[in-house]
Amino acid sequence: MGIDFLFILKALIIAIVEGLTEFVPVSSTGHMILVGDLIHFNTQSGGFPEMYEVVIQLGAILAVVVLYWRKISSSVVEFLSYIFSFIGLKASGDKRKYEKRLAESKTGFRFGINVIIGTIPAAILGLLFHDEIKEYLFSTKTVAIGFIVGGILLIVIENNFRKRAKRSKIVKDIDKMTYGQSLLVGCFQCLSLWPGMSRSASTIMGGWISGLSTTVATEFTFFLAIPAMVGASGLDLFKFDYSQMNATNLISLILGFIVAFIVSLVVIDKFINYLKKKPMRIFAIYRVFAGIVLAILIFTKVIS
């Protein structure tokens, strides 16, 4: 069987969509479902389109790791140092030495615990209801509803956040987050299990409600994406039937991963700079508009 270049082109379009939408509050999964249906990418049998989406999401996650490598690596080192220093403090008589190490590594340990806490709620729900979510929520109808509901919530919650920010303190340093704030953000991340809601929109809204600045909420969203998406992707990759893979599929995976990675690198940098100057309202308006258009297309049976 020869290489299907048209299918590879469609796969690259999906990878571009993933890179453009993964880290902005518009729902990458919703857009991939929609675009995949429009260009007939999702019609291939054997579950490859679903597995392909998982792989290109890993490409997007790699972009976060690259851009925030200094913060990630230092936090991992401090997290482990804190644990070993705590053990050493209990086992050794040299308390001064280990108490100093504990103080030096406390920031990284606290950050690591916040990420773990923020990951737990969606991880539990995702594991318990993985098959049900895939079966009942992954459709253009649920995406249309998610677009609209998420857009309205973004407008309402951001307006309340901006009023609150004028009269009370908000957290502007990601290392000053509390465990309670990370838990609330993690609970909001559960909304992202509904395609169309958007993981970044859900966690940013949770950040606003918990008292985080937009920039801190967004950056914490990026860090939460690493364990959340790697875990979900690992589960999907484990379940895939690789016996049906062919050369076209393999080329699509490699190129799609690279394209999603490159596009995500650009988008993350631009998005953070945008948020430092302007509100999220434009994304919310786009979501509502896209949801209405999608609902009309479904109602008129242009797409199913």
Swiss-Prot record:
Species of provenance: Clostridium perfringens (strain SM101 / Type A)
UniProt record, GO biological process: cell wall organization; peptidoglycan biosynthetic process; regulation of cell shape; response to antibiotic
Compartment(s) of residence: Cell membrane
UniProt keywords, alphabetically: Antibiotic resistance, Cell membrane, Cell shape, Cell wall biogenesis/degradation, Hydrolase, Membrane, Peptidoglycan synthesis, Transmembrane, Transmembrane helix
Catalytic activity field: di-trans,octa-cis-undecaprenyl diphosphate + H2O = di-trans,octa-cis-undecaprenyl phosphate + phosphate + H(+)
Record's function text: Catalyzes the dephosphorylation of undecaprenyl diphosphate (UPP). Confers resistance to bacitracin.
Pfam families to which the protein is assigned, alphabetical: BacA
Gene Ontology cellular component list: plasma membrane
EC number(s) per entry: 3.6.1.27
Family of the protein in this entry: Belongs to the UppP family.
Record flagged with keyword ATP-binding: no
Enzyme's top EC category: hydrolase
Entry's transmembrane regions: 5-25, 47-67, 72-92, 111-131, 137-157, 209-231, 248-268, 282-302
Protein name: Undecaprenyl-diphosphatase
InterPro entries recorded: UppP
Topology with respect to the bilayer: Multi-pass membrane protein
Keyword field contains Amino-acid biosynthesis: no
Molecular functions per Gene Ontology: undecaprenyl-diphosphatase activity
Encoding gene (name): uppP
